[in-house]
C-alpha cells in the first residue's frame, strides 16, 4: 500500500468541472488499494471517508510542500515549478496526469488576449508541460491521440530514455492511456424533473437537446443555437425542439470566465430571438451529484466545437456524461469520442460549423423512435466498459510499484523549471506591475536559498 497524494488545482466540492472531477474519481479508485490524500484549494471536500484532505492551493507553498514530502507517489495534472523541482530529492514519484492538451488549449483560451500576452502564456504552458514530462516516473493521458502528442514532445526534448526503450519498446510503462471514466452506478432521475422546473415553458411532450456543460472558446454553441432555430423555423405542427444549456457559471474559473465565448454566445442568442422560446440557458452550474436528473430528462445530448487542434486532442467530459446516461449524441466530427459515436452507433456526427447538417441530424434521431432506441441500446452496452474502475485499473499497480516505470530526467527538469521564470515574471509584471514581479522573484529566491524548502 502506497501513500498517494492526488493534487488538484481547483477546489473539489459539490460544483466541479473536468479537472476536479478527474482528480476526485481517480482518488476514489486508488483508495481501494492505497492510503490516499487529496490536496486542493479551500473550500474542498473529498466526499469519501477513506480519503484524507489537505486544503492547499498552489499558492500555499508550505502546506503543499509538506504534503508532497509525506507521499510516496503524487498524481498531479500540474505542479508549481519550485515544488516540481523538489520531487527527485524527496524521493516522491510523480505520475503526471496530462489528460488535458494544454499546449493547444492555451492557444484557444487566450485567443482574445493581446499577441504578447498569448506568447508569454503559450511559452509558460509549454515549458510547464516539458517540466512535468521530465519530472515524471510515469505519464497518463486520456486517449491514444494525446499519447502521440506527448510522445512527440518527449522525443523532441530528449526525454525518451535508451534504458526505458530497451526494456519496453512500446513505452507503455512510461506513458499510457487512462481515459476519463464513468461512475459505476447509473444516474437516478429526480423529482421534480429539473429542466422543466427551471424552464416551465418547455411542454411535457416537447423534445430537449442538452448542452451538457460550459461555454469555452474552443466550443461552438452558436452552431447548436442556429440548428435549433432551423428546426423551429421548419416546424408546422407537433412538439417543439428545445436546446438547454446546462451551465455557464463554472466554479474556480477566473481564466475561463475571462474568455469571451460566453459573451459571444449570449450576444448571438439575443440576436436570434430564440432565448425563452426554444433555447434556454442556466446561468449557474449544476451540482455534480445532481447532473443525472438533467441528463435523464433530455432526449439528446449535443457537443459542437470548432475545427482546430484542441478539438482533435480533447476528451470532452460532457460526452462521457451522455454515455453514462445512455443519452443519444449528436456531435461535431474530428475527435476521439466522435469516432466512437460513429463506430458504435451512439448517435450521429456532423462537420464543424454545419448548422443545417446539425439540424438534420437532430431531427433524424428525434423523429425516428427506432433509431433513437438503437442508439440508447448501444450506449447502455458501452457504459459498463468505461467505468473509472476499469479506466484507472493500471494506475493502482503503478502506484504500488508493481510495474517498472521510467526515470525522471533531472537535468531536463532543471532546464525547464528555470526557463519558466522569465515568462512567469513577465506575466506577473503585466498583471501586477513591477512591485508584484519583484515580490514573486524574492519569494522564489528565498525558497531557493532556504535549506529544505
Features from the language model and the residues they span:
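N-terminal subdomain of nucleotide-sugar transferases
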Residues: 1-45, 231-240, 434, 438-453
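Conserved donor-binding/catalytic core segment of Leloir-type glycosyltransferases
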Residues: 5-8, 140, 182-186, 194-219, ...
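C-terminal amphipathic helix plus adjacent low-complexity
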Residues: 171, 371, 381-453
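Nucleotide-activated donor-binding/catalytic signature segment of Leloir-type glycosyltransferases, i.e.
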Residues: 247-250, 256-293
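Short hydrophobic beta-strand element within catalytic cores of glycosyltransferases
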Residues: 300-303, 321-331
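Donor nucleotide-sugar binding/catalytic pocket of nucleotide-sugar-dependent glycosyltransferases
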Residues: 134-194, 204
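Acceptor-binding helix/loop patch of EC 2.4 sugar-transfer enzymes
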Residues: 9, 13, 96-127, 148-153, ...
Amino acid at each position: 500500500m502506497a501513500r498517494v497524494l492526488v493534487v488538484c488545482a481547483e477546489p473539489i466540492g459539490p460544483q466541479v468541472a473536468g479537472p476536479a472531477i478527474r482528480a476526485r474519481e481517480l482518488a476514489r479508485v486508488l483508495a481501494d488499494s492505497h492510503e490516499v490524500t487529496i490536496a486542493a484549494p479551500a473550500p474542498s471536500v473529498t466526499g469519501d471517508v477513506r480519503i484524507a484532505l489537505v486544503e492547499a492551493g498552489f499558492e500555499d507553498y508550505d502546506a503543499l510542500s509538506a504534503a508532497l514530502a509525506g507521499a510516496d507517489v503524487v498524481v498531479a495534472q500540474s505542479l508549481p515549478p519550485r515544488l516540481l523541482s523538489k520531487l527527485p530529492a524527496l524521493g516522491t514519484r510523480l505520475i503526471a496526469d496530462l489528460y488535458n492538451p494544454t499546449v493547444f488549449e492555451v492557444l484557444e483560451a487566450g485567443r482574445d488576449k493581446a499577441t504578447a500576452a498569448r506568447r508569454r502564456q503559450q511559452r509558460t504552458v509549454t515549458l510547464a508541460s516539458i517540466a512535468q514530462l521530465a519530472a515524471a516516473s510515469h505519464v497518463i493521458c486520456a486517449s491514444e491521440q494525446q499519447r502521440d502528442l506527448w510522445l512527440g514532445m518527449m522525443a523532441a526534448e530528449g526525454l525518451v530514455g535508451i534504458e526505458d526503450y530497451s526494456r519496453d519498446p512500446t513505452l507503455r510503462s512510461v506513458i499510457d492511456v487512462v481515459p476519463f471514466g464513468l461512475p459505476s452506478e447509473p444516474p437516478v432521475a429526480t423529482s421534480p424533473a429539473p429542466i422543466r422546473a427551471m424552464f416551465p415553458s418547455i411542454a411535457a411532450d416537447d423534445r430537449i437537446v442538452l448542452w451538457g456543460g460550459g461555454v469555452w472558446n474552443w466550443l461552438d454553441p452558436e452552431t447548436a443555437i442556429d440548428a435549433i432555430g432551423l428546426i423551429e423555423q421548419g416546424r408546422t405542427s407537433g412538439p417543439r425542439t428545445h436546446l438547454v444549456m446546462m451551465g455557464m457559471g463554472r466554479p474556480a474559473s477566473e481564466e475561463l470566465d475571462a474568455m469571451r465565448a460566453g459573451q459571444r454566445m449570449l450576444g448571438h442568442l439575443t440576436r436570434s430571438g430564440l432565448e425563452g422560446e426554444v433555447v434556454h440557458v442556466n446561468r449557474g452550474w449544476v451540482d455534480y451529484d445532481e447532473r443525472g436528473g438533467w441528463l435523464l430528462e433530455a432526449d439528446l445530448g449535443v457537443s459542437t466545437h470548432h475545427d482546430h487542434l484542441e478539438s482533435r486532442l480533447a476528451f470532452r467530459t460532457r460526452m462521457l456524461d451522455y454515455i453514462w446516461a445512455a443519452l443519444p449524441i449528436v456531435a461535431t466530427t474530428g475527435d476521439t469520442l466522435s469516432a466512437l459515436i460513429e463506430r458504435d452507433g451512439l448517435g450521429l456526427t456532423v462537420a464543424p460549423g454545419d448548422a443545417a447538417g446539425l439540424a438534420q441530424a437532430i431531427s433524424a434521431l428525434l423523429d425516428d423512435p427506432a433509431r433513437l432506441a438503437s442508439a440508447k441500446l448501444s450506449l447502455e452496452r458501452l457504459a459498463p466498459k468505461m467505468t473509472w474502475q476499469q479506466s484507472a485499473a493500471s494506475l493502482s499497480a503503478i502506484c504500488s510499484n508493481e510495474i517498472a516505470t521510467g526515470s525522471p530526467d533531472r537535468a531536463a527538469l532543471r532546464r525547464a523549471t528555470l526557463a519558466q521564470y522569465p515568462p512567469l515574471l513577465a506575466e506577473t509584471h503585466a498583471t501586477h506591475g513591477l512591485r508584484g514581479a519583484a515580490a514573486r522573484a524574492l519569494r522564489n529566491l528565498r525558497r531557493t536559498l532556504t535549506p529544505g524548502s
